[in-house]
Amino acid sequence: MTTLSCDLAIVGGGLAGGLIALALAEMRPALDVRLVEGGASIGGNHLWSFFTSDVGVGDQWIVEPLIGHRWPAHRVRFPAHERRIDVGYRTIVSTRLNAVVRERLRERAMTGCKALAANAHAVVLADGRRIEARGVIDTRGAGDLSLLECGWQKFVGHELELAAPHGGDTPTIMDATVAQIDGYRFAYTLPLSPTRMFVEDTCYSDTPGVDAAALGARIGAYAAGQGWTVKQVAREEAGALPVVLDGDFEAYWQSGGHNVAKAGMRAGLFHPTTGYSLPDAVRTAALIARQRDYSGTALCDLLHGVAKRTWEQRRFYRMLARMLFRAAEPQMRYKVLDRFYRLDPALVGRFYAGRSTIGDKMRILTGKPPVPIGRAFSAMLGRPA
């Protein structure tokens, strides 16, 4: 058995692992970091989009080299109102993450290396090699989600090459004027070039199964409805993000491995209501880059503490998720978001960043809820509707 030695091994080359590796390469260049990924590339096949308000000013250096598309504003559309929000929107393409990580880490970015097991100080690879390290961070996606009560944000996205310019210049992050199927459904569009449009069909659904053919057909119908002629589908992606209503944090943390540091989805570091993990991934990468002790025990204690505090601080978001899934009838869930997007854009930005103030929370709950009051109270208290 061949044994490799390093200071820190990061297992999982997705968004969380990639950002940690890049932050350490910048802030701790003397540290020998190995990024271990079972797939052929870092980041897989994804787009990650975020609002400029999602990332603190002091952390922007982490994502700045990765941004492939920038817009000064974004839009939302609902049956009863439409709104342009003058908050910047950014997109990272996984191919760019892969390129930048490989440039910075070179041979220390170990793709095509499946990890069979990881503990606080070692990683065992499927090819028989073993990596021994002062510390290990496991970022290999979600733990056992059955330990959490979840709804799902599931989606299929197609990057469309069009026969003629589409004429758009602003992302529409929610177009809920589409038929409400399988819960709260909306189309999501990113104008990537004058003739290229990324279109995603998304549902806040009770089930995680993704019917790629059905959602792909809806994307085709949506494009036709916009008057676009599709030359080809240049790229496709699909997924289902957990929307957390409740659960046992400690059991979830342990399900991803005992006594080993974890980050990203595996640590439960994602927004309970949206399922998005980029803001937490950036904050975690910055935090790790500021550390001095990279031993397995120190990293586990640090990240477990962060994840547990974050879970406790996000009770409000889990309550809102319960209201969305338990209090609203599936075809009427869009009304919850319709009302939300009439609020102050700064409040909306803090919500997505996971940094809502007490005043924000009061404002979100003020007034007549867009769902039956009795069901709303039951959801708030964590009772079945």
Where are these regions (language model features)?
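N-terminal Rossmann-like FAD-binding beta1-loop-alpha1 element of flavoenzymes
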Residues: 2-35
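N-terminal FAD cofactor-binding segment of flavoenzymes
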Residues: 23-27, 31-80, 156
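A conserved beta-strand/loop capping segment in the N-terminal third of enzymes
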Residues: 52-120
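Predominantly flavin-linked oxidoreductase catalytic cores and closely associated redox partners
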Residues: 108-233, 245-251
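FAD-binding beta-loop-beta segment adjacent to the flavin cofactor pocket
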Residues: 181-184, 240-262, 312, 316, ...
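Short FAD-binding loop at a beta-strand-to-alpha-helix junction that anchors the flavin cofactor
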Residues: 189, 195, 255-273
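Flavin-binding catalytic cores
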Residues: 208-238, 261, 282-307
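C-terminal helical "tail/cap" subdomain of flavin- and related membrane-associated enzymes
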Residues: 286-385
